[in-house]
Regions:
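Feature of Fe-S/electron-transfer and energy-metabolism proteins
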Residues: 1-188
């Protein structure tokens, strides 16, 4: 189980650690060879390697490839790195620390201001400022407020929401909890 790493055109993909061998276009019939040769005998199956990761000195990190080296993964930083179904792996990578900090150190109004000042925008095409949206919700007088996760892709073939929900669902839950605290939600 793992989340989305990008490079969808090369999938299915598999990374074997600790050296980070990046196998591409893996088929079910390739698995016995990977297990026997790589996992049991310690020999990389070179025919399945993403060639850009192969150097005369060995295998370079996927993060050093042309596709990744200029990227800074923020929202997707854990995708493909942690088991998305294991909360302990999320916590081990500082998961839920932002929520703990918000609850312990900031008022809801301060959280909204921090989000406004950050320039954070929604992942949809409109790019609406998140802090502004939260301030509208916080100002709304209601007996009950909700935080909802709209993860319905509007563009056919787009996997922005799917990738984060499948690869790092706890980051979404943590963000929803922070939003709930900031706007005064009672349900989510």
């Amino acid at each position: 189980r793992t989340g989305w790493l990008g490079l969808c055109a090369l999938g299915p993909i598999m990374i074997v650690y600790p050296e980070g061998s990046f196998y591409i276009m893996v088929k079910p019939e390739d698995i016995p060879e990977i297990v026997t040769e790589h996992l049991l005998k310690g020999r990389v199956v070179t025919r399945l390697l993403y060639q850009e990761t192969v150097t005369p000195d060995g295998i370079k990190s996927l993060n050093e490839t042309d596709f990744y080296k200029k990227q800074h993964r923020s929202a997707l930083r854990n995708c493909g790195v942690i088991d998305p179904e294991n909360i302990n792996e999320y916590i081990a990578r500082d998961g839920y620390q932002a929520l703990a900090k918000c609850l312990a150190e900031y008022t809801p109004e301060q959280v909204i201001q921090i989000v406004k000042d950050s320039g954070l925008r929604g992942r949809g095409g409109a790019g609406f400022p998140t802090g502004v949206k939260w301030s509208f919700a916080a100002a709304n007088q209601a007996d009950q407020k909700y935080v909802c996760c709209n993860a319905d892709e509007g563009d056919p073939g787009a996997f922005m929401d799917r990738s984060i929900l499948e690869g790092d669902p706890n980051v979404v839950i943590e963000a929803m909890a922070i939003a709930g605290y900031a706007i005064g939600a009672t349900q989510g």
